[in-house]
């Protein structure tokens, strides 16, 4: 189970979760763990009920946020972690509260998502620290809405940069360049997860 996380809202965590899922084998499951602002179902184009839906556009399965969360969030994630038959990616909420820490604690690894701007990178570094504090390794980072690789970003975040994803007009995952970048990031992620 991989938590797709970043401290700042609006940096592309949900898009990255779907983009990576589309590029991974075995029709991964993407879980929306953002109880306050659940939008995975809308981006994936599936109903917002409490069961997994196949998302043909991204060749994955999507589990929207169940209405009875957050109390059952950790139970749901623990169950999925044990029972999953394919990669499971958890779209986490922004911030440093309990809602953000729960998926980090349960996951086997974390993928950070950030834009290249300094405040977002600082927040991503805080998320990395939070993951490490609960004993979860940070496997890498994806920078969104940029083709630039800021100097020392791997050192700041304490993990390798899996990829950079360009900005796109309209729906990012409809853009071929964006999909290709997520495919490259997913390949790097698979290399990083062979040790898990």
Where are these regions (language model features)?
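P-loop/Walker A phosphate-binding loop and immediately adjacent motor/lid segment at beta-alpha junctions
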Residues: 74, 81, 126-145
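Short hydrophobic/aromatic beta-strand immediately N-terminal to the Walker A/P-loop
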Residues: 1-3
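Short, well-ordered alpha-helices that flank and scaffold nucleotide-derived cofactor binding pockets
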Residues: 18, 22-26, 105, 126-129, ...
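Inter-motif core of Ras-like GTPase G domains
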Residues: 81-85, 94-119, 124
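P-loop/Walker-type NTP enzyme "switch/lid" segment
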Residues: 5-7, 18, 26-86
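Conserved beta-strand segments of the P-loop GTPase G domain that flank and frequently precede/overlap
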Residues: 63-65, 91, 112-116, 141-144
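C-terminal lobe/tail of nucleotide-utilizing enzymes
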Residues: 134-196
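Conserved lysine of the Walker
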Residues: 13
């Amino acid at each position: 189970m991989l938590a797709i996380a970043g401290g700042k809202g609006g940096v592309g965590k949900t898009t990255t979760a779907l983009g990576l899922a589309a590029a991974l084998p075995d029709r991964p499951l993407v879980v929306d763990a953002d109880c306050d602002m659940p939008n995975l179902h809308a981006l994936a184009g599936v109903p917002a009920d409490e069961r997994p839906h196949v998302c043909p556009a991204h060749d994955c399965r999507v589990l929207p946020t169940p209405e009875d969360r957050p109390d059952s969030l950790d139970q749901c994630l623990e169950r999925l972690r044990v029972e999953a038959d394919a990669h499971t990616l958890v779209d986490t909420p922004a911030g440093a509260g309990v809602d953000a820490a729960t998926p980090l604690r349960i996951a086997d690894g974390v993928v950070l998502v950030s834009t290249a701007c300094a405040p977002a990178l600082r927040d991503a570094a805080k998320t990395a620290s939070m993951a490490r504090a609960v004993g979860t390794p940070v496997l890498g980072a994806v920078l969104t809405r940029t083709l630039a690789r800021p100097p020392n970003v791997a050192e700041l975040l304490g993990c390798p940069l899996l990829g950079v994803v360009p900005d796109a007009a309209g729906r990012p995952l409809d853009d071929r360049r964006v999909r290709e970048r997520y495919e490259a990031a997913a390949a790097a992620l698979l290399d990083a997860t062979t040790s898990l």
